[in-house]
Amino acid sequence: MKTTFLDFEQQIAELESKIEELRFVQDESSVDISDEIKTLSEKSLQLTKDIYANLTPWQVSQVARHPQRPYTLDYVGGLFTDFHELHGDRTFADDQSIIGGLARFDSQPCMVIGHQKGRDTKERALRNFGMSRPEGYRKAMRLMRLAEKFSIPVFTFVDTPGAFPGIDAEERNQSEAIGRNLYVQAELTVPIIATIIGEGGSGGALAIAMGDVVLMLQNSTYSVISPEGCASILWKTADKASEAAEQLGLTAQRIKALGLIDKIVAEPIGGAHRDYDVMMANMRKALSDSLKTFDGMKEDALLERRHERLMSYGKFKEITVKA
């Protein structure tokens, strides 16, 4: 699959294009230009390292939305075995922006739930671009309750711009569905391990992200609103999205500094989409280490740990500033 380059990666794109041209020439002739190819490849790698070491929050947002970034079904295929998808909320419909089902992780039975955006136009429409309606969240809630019944851990993968804001979603009580999911996650008697793999957009993300362990990929985002949405409200124009991204503090490093997540999962150089194998290996270790935290932990201890975690959010200290 040919890599899609973002606007700020155009220098890398030009180098990679030259490398491809040289490889074609070498394949079609007897001329040995392997040294030139090696030199350009090293230059491209170093340039990628330099650019990705200094990404702005707005650039991180673009990487988090990259169309070739691994989605939930990619992680399901790369990390889990015996996946059996379960459908529907048993109330209204099967929202395909959220997928979920029974699986095994390192031979251990588990439940997997996550957003799915879609790769092409047809699938994106089917998945509603990863923006869930109430029936999607109710499906997730049903699967969480099923995991509790079977006493198996829950793995969630978050990648959504936010909950769908359409009239039909509001008619079916979108806010209640999200709020109910938060309630259920707070009292669920099995471990929940949540990972932000792309966009973590507002309540639409939080509805399946209230984990006992919360991970974030290095170039993912987690925020109450998108940069464009924030800019449209504050400055009446989406052109200020870059400035809004700076103010929102949506990067993994910023969220970790606030104590809202537990660990940042490293991505391959150039983003998760550049090397699926490396990304899967990094993710497998992060999930495995997280799951070991709950080995032998009793339900009461699990719930106490979770409630302490939730109650620690939003604490502040008053200080007196001398004039």
UniProtKB/Swiss-Prot annotation:
Its EC number is 2.1.3.15. HAMAP family: AcetylCoA_CT_alpha. One of its GO terms (cellular component) is acetyl-CoA carboxylase complex. Acetyl-CoA carboxylase is a heterohexamer composed of biotin carboxyl carrier protein (AccB), biotin carboxylase (AccC) and two subunits each of ACCase subunit alpha (AccA) and ACCase subunit beta (AccD). Gene3D superfamilies: 2-enoyl-CoA Hydratase, Chain A, domain 1 (3.90.226.10). It comes from Polynucleobacter asymbioticus (strain DSM 18221 / CIP 109841 / QLW-P1DMWA-1). Residues 40-293 form the CoA carboxyltransferase C-terminal domain. NCBIfam families: accA, AccA_sub, PRK05724.1. Its main location: cytoplasm. It is an enzyme of class 2 (transferase). Keywords: ATP-binding, Cytoplasm, Fatty acid biosynthesis, Fatty acid metabolism, Lipid biosynthesis, Lipid metabolism, Nucleotide-binding, Transferase. The keyword Membrane does not apply. GO terms for biological process: fatty acid biosynthetic process; malonyl-CoA biosynthetic process. Pathway: Lipid metabolism; malonyl-CoA biosynthesis; malonyl-CoA from acetyl-CoA: step 1/1. It catalyses: N(6)-carboxybiotinyl-L-lysyl-[protein] + acetyl-CoA = N(6)-biotinyl-L-lysyl-[protein] + malonyl-CoA. It is found in: Cytoplasm. Belongs to the AccA family. One of its GO terms (molecular function) is carboxyl- or carbamoyltransferase activity. This is Acetyl-coenzyme A carboxylase carboxyl transferase subunit alpha. Component of the acetyl coenzyme A carboxylase (ACC) complex. First, biotin carboxylase catalyzes the carboxylation of biotin on its carrier protein (BCCP) and then the CO(2) group is transferred by the carboxyltransferase to acetyl-CoA to form malonyl-CoA. Pfam families: ACCA.
